[in-house]
């Protein structure tokens, strides 16, 4: 006997309504509706803190084929505001599976909808840009859903880094996962890194630990003085959700690290914060970049790398100072993907070198960070 699901509605702020069925918790959720083109990795996407206050549309038609497990998470909980998919498979099968996707969503109290035309929705978002939306589960009331969608204030001006961040520092030594072994432990660190948690993904911390780093994770609002009290060899600025401009506490701390010539590496929101710290400007993108197949050109050696991306804001390259050299650009739309300072050991990248999900083509940036720390120690 096939399972039966309650009705659900997706409403966009422009009045567009989609009808489907609920595969998660009852109730409603509001946020910015975005689309992600990754074929796999839905569990990592859901638990990525960068998706806070965003309702994620997965464009691949079949989502949930391999279920979920306790290992493939990027945070302690689901951070995405909601989930939108085309089809939920009746049967999920994988040797690592512990629960079905629907069971997981209900347990995490995530409102989710399936059974809608995600191709049509993606075209709307592509042409009109990311929109505020509402998923209403268990109730057939389109006008209520539209009104709720329009009540969401939008992400511009919203400081979410301090919302998703930890409140107390902690140590991290878990390394990357390997088949037959699981996760490893770094017990012979060569470097000490202070990692700012603006919404950090676990796999970033694992890749740092894999490269010989003892990692001290600190809250987003940690001052530069408090961070430097740990006597780190380098500072890492993590990914995270929301608008970078309100994060004045992080911008001020980053300025201090750069002035002191502390090796500093930023990813995603950390990249944007570094851009603001050196005097640049950021802007809200029309649709943002969300996917695991984004081509980026490394301007230093000319190679093309496939990257994982998840951001709705970007740094304006024209606003950067003379000592900031552009290192990477998107081959989709030409937007800035990375820059370095020519007179300081500081650099950053807009995408996600740690992937999870996605390719590890640009994981060499972590090696560059450890090389900068090694040079400073000498």
Curated annotation (Swiss-Prot):
Binding site for L-glutamine: 50, 240, 242, 269, 272, 310, 312-313
Active site: 268, 352, 354
EC number: 6.3.5.5
Signal peptide start and end residues: none
Sample GO molecular function, one term: carbamoyl-phosphate synthase (glutamine-hydrolyzing) activity
Pfam families in UniProt: CPSase_sm_chain, GATase
CPSase as annotated region, ranges: 1-188
CDD domains: GATase1_CPSase
Catalytic activity: hydrogencarbonate + L-glutamine + 2 ATP + H2O = carbamoyl phosphate + L-glutamate + 2 ADP + phosphate + 2 H(+)
Segments forming domain Glutamine amidotransferase type-1: 192-378
EC category name: ligase
Pathway info: Amino-acid biosynthesis; L-arginine biosynthesis; carbamoyl phosphate from bicarbonate: step 1/1; Pyrimidine metabolism; UMP biosynthesis via de novo pathway; (S)-dihydroorotate from bicarbonate: step 1/3
Gene3D superfamilies, per database record: 3.40.50.880, Carbamoyl-phosphate synthase small subunit, N-terminal domain (3.50.30.20)
Cross-referenced PROSITE patterns: GATASE_TYPE_1
BP GO terms, sorted: 'de novo' pyrimidine nucleobase biosynthetic process; 'de novo' UMP biosynthetic process; glutamine metabolic process; L-arginine biosynthetic process
SUPFAM superfamilies: Carbamoyl phosphate synthetase, small subunit N-terminal domain, Class I glutamine amidotransferase-like
Keyword set, alphabetical order: Amino-acid biosynthesis, Arginine biosynthesis, ATP-binding, Glutamine amidotransferase, Ligase, Nucleotide-binding, Pyrimidine biosynthesis
Keyword set includes Amino-acid biosynthesis: yes
Job description of the protein: Small subunit of the glutamine-dependent carbamoyl phosphate synthetase (CPSase). CPSase catalyzes the formation of carbamoyl phosphate from the ammonia moiety of glutamine, carbonate, and phosphate donated by ATP, constituting the first step of 2 biosynthetic pathways, one leading to arginine and/or urea and the other to pyrimidine nucleotides. The small subunit (glutamine amidotransferase) binds and cleaves glutamine to supply the large subunit with the substrate ammonia.
Oligomeric and partner information: Composed of two chains; the small (or glutamine) chain promotes the hydrolysis of glutamine to ammonia, which is used by the large (or ammonia) chain to synthesize carbamoyl phosphate. Tetramer of heterodimers (alpha,beta)4.
Protein family: Belongs to the CarA family.
Name recorded for this polypeptide: Carbamoyl phosphate synthase small chain
Protein's organism: Ralstonia nicotianae (strain ATCC BAA-1114 / GMI1000)
Lineage of source species: Bacteria, Pseudomonadati, Pseudomonadota, Betaproteobacteria, Burkholderiales
Encoding gene per record: carA
């Amino acid at each position: 006997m096939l399972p039966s699901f309650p009705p659900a509605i997706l409403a966009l702020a422009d009045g567009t309504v989609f009808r489907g069925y609920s595969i998660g918790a009852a109730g409603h959720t509001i946020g910015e509706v975005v689309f992600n083109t990754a074929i796999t990795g839905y569990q990592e996407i859901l638990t990525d803190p960068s998706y806070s206050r965003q309702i994620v549309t997965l464009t691949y038609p079949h989502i949930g084929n391999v279920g979920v497990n306790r290992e493939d998470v990027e945070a302690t909980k689901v951070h995405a505001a909601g989930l939108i998919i085309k089809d939920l498979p009746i049967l999920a099968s994988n040797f690592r599976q512990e629960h079905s996707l629907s069971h997981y969503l209900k347990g995490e109290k995530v409102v989710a909808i399936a059974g809608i035309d995600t191709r049509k929705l993606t075209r709307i978002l592509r042409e009109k840009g990311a929109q505020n939306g509402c998923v209403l589960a268990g109730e057939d009331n389109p006008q209520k859903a539209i009104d709720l969608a329009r009540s969401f204030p939008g992400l511009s001006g919203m400081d979410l880094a301090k919302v998703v961040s930890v409140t107390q520092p902690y140590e991290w030594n878990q390394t990357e996962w390997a088949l037959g072994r699981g996760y490893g432990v770094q017990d012979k660190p060569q470097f000490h890194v202070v990692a700012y948690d603006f919404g950090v993904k676990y796999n970033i911390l694992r890749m740092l630990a894999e490269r010989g780093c003892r990692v001290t994770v600190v809250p987003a609002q940690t001052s530069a003085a408090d961070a430097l009290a740990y006597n780190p060899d380098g500072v890492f600025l993590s990914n995270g959700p929301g608008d970078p401009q309100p994060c004045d506490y992080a911008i001020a701390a980053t300025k201090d690290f750069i002035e002191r010539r502390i090796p500093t590496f930023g990813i995603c929101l950390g990249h944007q914060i570094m851009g603001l710290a050196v005097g640049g400007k950021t802007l809200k993108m029309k649709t943002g970049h969300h996917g695991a197949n984004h081509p980026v050109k490394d301007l230093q050696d000319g190679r093309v790398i496939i990257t994982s991306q998840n951001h709705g804001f970007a740094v304006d390259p024209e606003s950067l100072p003379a000592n900031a050299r552009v290192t990477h650009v998107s081959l989709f739309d030409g937007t800035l993907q990375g820059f370095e300072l020519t007179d300081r050991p500081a650099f950053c990248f807009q995408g996600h070198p740690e992937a999870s999900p996605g390719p590890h083509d640009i994981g060499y940036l972590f090696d560059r960070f450890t090389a900068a720390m090694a040079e400073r120690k000498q």
